[in-house]
């Protein structure tokens, strides 16, 4: 069975829903369909269902630019975010465009017809071929099937429950049980207070090394007051602009004055702990924003640690035992449940096998043009959100650019666009930037590479991107456009796997 479509959006998470909404309002002449492998929209916010799941960015910047987040809550629960996305789906009538329980297996671009031939497996596990003019990959950057798990010595000896947050058991009973959470990132610092409040006998956060953690208010009182005296849209725009500036300011200051920011963060944590917990557990060896800065609402993590309901250990695992974890220091952590909050397994485009005329593509040897399109790959965009700000900010600017590009192609009568790569621009760093987080280090052999200069340099700077993409010319000598009747030989060939 073959099906001809115009634009194929892969993924109905926050990126896919955002792209679809922008296309609906900014390029309404283009038709699109959305493929979603799961039964529901939401992506990350449908997959992760562990206790306390929430955003780690403020919702005024995590919400879309076209739809105000109408709540004073700074951070939001996973269910609230799914509800917000459902509203977008309803407002833009997207439900009829989404094909649930459909999975893209492979995609081959045929240069003769200038079409993508996409192999799809439907809910009945029957294979179909969809023929698309343009693809937008909105699958995020991690493997939905499994998270990253280190090789824990003797793990099989453990008689309790071993859980990864990515696959949280429904109705897990942890009341009255001893829980050890391995990790110190956003997931771990969310789980500790949530499981403690949920009735666990004791929760221990076991970390190999400390992480910077900032406490932020759970309610944005300024925004709440503005909403009462200003139109909702204006209050949202002002709050969004303020928070974008604050985010960027903290990140920039961390790069330029790391000692100053470190001193401030550590002093803030010390005030939260009130001498009840040793500061060695919250004093990282790296500088602020060398890894992503984690946040907690109203210092909930520190409150739980002060109360004694939870504790933190900075150590390394010697091995698992039948009853818990033996640490290299000699200490034993008793556990009924162990949660491995050890990060994500990086994966691009949902693991789709991509080819051009049957020849495999290698994204790790490619760059991103304007942070949106893969070098030497025709008629495809890929959404990778910011690592130092809200993911959705990138979705908005990328969607605006994609809509402008498609409108330009329609006006000029073009069927194909290819960002022609310049290998002299290729760097060793990936587009994830200079962060040293474990999951980013593991992305080196998967992620597209950073470029030295624009338009190949991914800035991870929303304000810079918004200006650059809004004003970007399409006749820049890098984008190569073709019509179906064109026979002009391209200057470069797609990057292939040898």
Swiss-Prot record:
What parts of the sequence cross the membrane? 4-24
EC class of the enzyme, as a word: oxidoreductase
Q: Which SUPFAM superfamilies match?
A: FAD/NAD(P)-binding domain (SSF51905)
Top-level taxonomy:
Bacteria, Pseudomonadati, Pseudomonadota, Gammaproteobacteria, Moraxellales
Native source species: Acinetobacter baylyi (strain ATCC 33305 / BD413 / ADP1)
Q: Which residues bind FAD?
A: 15, 36, 56, 62, 104, 395
What GO cellular component entries does it have?
A: plasma membrane
As to how many cofactors bind and how, the note says:
Binds 1 FAD per subunit.
Q: Which pathway, per its entry? A: Hydrocarbon metabolism; alkane degradation
Protein residues bound to NADP(+)? 54-56, 184-190, 208-209, 292-293
Record's signal peptide: none
Q: What is this protein called?
A: Probable FAD-binding monooxygenase AlmA
Primary site of residence: membrane
- PANTHER family for this protein: MONOOXYGENASE, PUTATIVE (AFU_ORTHOLOGUE AFUA_8G02570)-RELATED
User: Which gene does this sequence derive from?
Assistant: almA
| Superkingdom as given in the UniProt entry | Bacteria
> What keywords would UniProt list here?
Cell membrane, FAD, Flavoprotein, Membrane, Monooxygenase, NADP, Oxidoreductase, Transmembrane, Transmembrane helix
The UniProt record lists the EC number as 1.14.13.-
Which InterPro entries does the entry mention?
FAD-binding_MO, FAD/NAD-bd_sf, Flavin_mOase-like
The cellular location(s) given in this protein's UniProt record come to: Cell membrane
